[in-house]
Every structure is written in C-alpha cells, then in structure tokens.
Swiss-Prot record:
Highest taxon listed in the record's lineage: Bacteria
Pfam families: Ribosomal_S13 (PF00416)
Family designation: Belongs to the universal ribosomal protein uS13 family.
Gene Ontology cellular component annotations, sorted alphabetically: cytosol; small ribosomal subunit
GO terms, molecular function: rRNA binding; structural constituent of ribosome; tRNA binding
Protein role: Located at the top of the head of the 30S subunit, it contacts several helices of the 16S rRNA. In the 70S ribosome it contacts the 23S rRNA (bridge B1a) and protein L5 of the 50S subunit (bridge B1b), connecting the 2 subunits; these bridges are implicated in subunit movement. Contacts the tRNAs in the A and P-sites.
Residue span of region Disordered: 99-125
GO biological process: translation
Keywords for this protein: Ribonucleoprotein, Ribosomal protein, RNA-binding, rRNA-binding, tRNA-binding
Name of the protein described by the UniProt record: Small ribosomal subunit protein uS13
Amino acid sequence: MARIAGIDLPNNKQLQIALTSIYGIGRARALEICRKTDILPEKRAKDLDNDEVNKLRKIIESDYVVEGKLRSELAMSIKRLMDIACYRGLRHRKGLPLRGQRTKTNARTRKGKRKTVANKKMAAK
C-alpha cells in the first residue's frame, strides 16, 4: 500500500483515481502528476514499485499544496476575510451564501435546518 502525503492510496484502484483520495488532488491534477512522473494513469496502485512511489511523493510534495497545509491555508484565508470585516467575511461569519445568491427562499444548505418561529401565524393576523 503506497502512502503519499500521509494518505494510504487504495490498492485496487487505478493510479489516476487513487491519487484523488489525497485532499487537493482532483482528476485533472492526478493525470498531470502521472504525466510528469511518466507513470501510466491506468496502472493499479498495488502494482507501483518503490521508485515510482518515491517519484510520486517527490512531485506531490514539491509542486503542490495538499492535505493539512491546503486545509490550513483555506482556513487562514477565510479567517482573514472575517478579520477585515469585508462583505464576504461577514457572510462567512453569519453562515450565509457569499456570492449574491438569494436567501429569502433558498440557501438551505448554507443556512442549515429550518428554525421554526413560535406563534408566527398568530403574529401575522
């Protein structure tokens, strides 16, 4: 089992798919990594030898920001927006959509489960 960037790659999957189990690597980037290391993307992860695993590890660690470092960069970016109190930071703080979507009827995913207001119908009358 190949271990790259602190993640065990699934053995039975093709390399291009197995690499996507690393946070920060999608299909396009996985193919790019395979092309840089001259390893066939269709090769199974269990069939990789130590040289190939070391090549992959070296390319990923030197050229790409993945896993914990990427997560912390994203968190710091959001924290910076909240600290400078810009519009996007305020929306992050309130847990609302950032990019101009309507919130009167939609945005349930971002806002969370509905919170019922007691006696709302009585107040409307």
